[in-house]
Design a protein with these regions (language model features):
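Ser/Thr/Gly/Pro-rich, low-complexity flexible regions
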Residues: 1, 5-193
Length: 193
């Protein structure tokens, strides 16, 4: 079974006619999905921000970004994405592991960039902060080693109603050292410079 394959089947209840209930019928459909065990170390090392809607809005010369990630030694099931979009601004993401069929990621409100770097001017308290969008689910795949993240940005210190920048979609995929080296040689925007 490949990483994203599932197996579906229809089961037929075999019983005496008098024990059948019309309300429920005698068939049920079952779908088995492949689930890989969670290992936090699958999400450390080189990672490629494959795409981000933020790039199109504020980093027009960037289509992908190579970063490094490491396991947070102080928080369970959490990684630190070093220099995520801007140098000196790391982002922490926590992986939920209580339901492997619903593998979600969580992110607390945290600094994302300086307003000068992001917008070429000073706004509010001079920093852009990022938090997990409350409207959409962000998730991960241990089998495919990626996260799909909805991230909402805001600027503290701005007047109420004018502090939110927007919600952006990021897709981050972990790559091998060899793949990272090829990306570096190809000139992919990277935080490792």
């Amino acid at each position: 079974i490949e990483v994203t394959d599932s197996l579906g089947m229809v089961l037929q209840l075999v019983s005496k006619e008098e024990s059948k209930w019309e309300l429920y019928g005698t068939e049920t459909k079952v779908i088995l999905e492949k689930v890989c065990p969670f290992d936090i170390h699958l999400f450390e090392g080189y990672a490629l921000i494959v795409t981000s809607t933020y790039f199109g809005s504020y980093m027009k010369d960037v289509s992908q970004r190579l970063i490094r990630t490491k396991v947070d030694p102080n928080a369970e099931n959490t990684i630190i994405m070093k220099d995520y979009f801007y140098k000196g601004y790391d982002l922490k993401v926590k992986f939920t592991t209580n339901d492997l069929l619903n593998p979600l990621i969580e992110m607390e409100d945290q600094p994302f960039a300086s307003t000068m770097e992001a917008f070429d001017t000073i706004y509010g308290d001079w920093e852009v902060w990022a938090y997990q969008s409350g409207y959409y689910l962000s998730y991960y795949s241990s089998c495919e080693r990626f996260i799909f993240q909805y991230m909402t940005l805001h600027v503290p210190g701005m007047p109420a109603g004018k502090d939110e920048v927007g919600t952006y979609i990021n897709v981050v995929k972990w790559v091998s050292d060899d793949e990272a080296q090829i990306l570096i040689e190809e000139g992919v925007n990277n935080s490792l410079k």
